[in-house]
Amino acid sequence: MNSPIQIWTCAAFHPAYGCGGWASVRSAQGQLTGAAGGQRNTTARRMALAGLAAALRDLPPGGKPIASGPIDIRTTSPELALFADVLNSLGQPTQSAPPGEDLDLWAPILTASAGRRLTLVRIPLEPGTPMAFTAAWAELARDKAKAGGAFTAAIPKGNLAKVPGLRLQVRAAD
């Protein structure tokens, strides 16, 4: 079995302004990727789902070598943790149906989960961890969305390389 794909995802939401941000970092076979985004007139739940959907969006189908391993998802989001039973059942013979709301965000999650085992765990936010890095980017994304509206951007590889607990594998020159 291939090594697991690890995902750290966080969401930040400001209820007074109705704006939110999300960030996710993914480690798959030593390759790190990260993205952040945000929008106005949203909910905390949509931001949590958007972060997970973004982390899963460009994975190859479950039968491909990089993607055949399980997906371990770590989050601090209570909104995403509410869906733990649904997410943990994806890819299993007795799969739970996703909620009927936010289907635009559930679609990429369901597509990416085909043929894979997902495990979602809510963890505490501790300084100097990949989760703290992801939470900081989610807060930055929330503030940027409040000021400028909807956006999505990649987290620079240079920033990912500095995260304690993550190792960035540099591709050899072709």
Locate predicted features.
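RNase H-like nuclease fold core
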Residues: 1-46, 57-58, 64, 167-174
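RNase H catalytic domain
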Residues: 13-16, 52-136
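Short, low-complexity, polar/charged sequence segments that are solvent-exposed and flexible
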Residues: 25-28, 43, 91-94, 139-143
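Short, surface-exposed, polar/charged, turn-prone segments marking secondary-structure boundaries
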Residues: 33-36, 53, 99-103, 147-151
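Low-complexity, flexible helical/coil segments
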Residues: 41-46, 60-63, 107-111, 155-161
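Loop-to-helix element that buttresses phosphate recognition and phosphoryl-transfer chemistry
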Residues: 47, 51
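Short, electropositive alpha-helical surface patch
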Residues: 130-148
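Acidic two-metal-ion nuclease catalytic site recognized across multiple nuclease folds
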Residues: 144-174
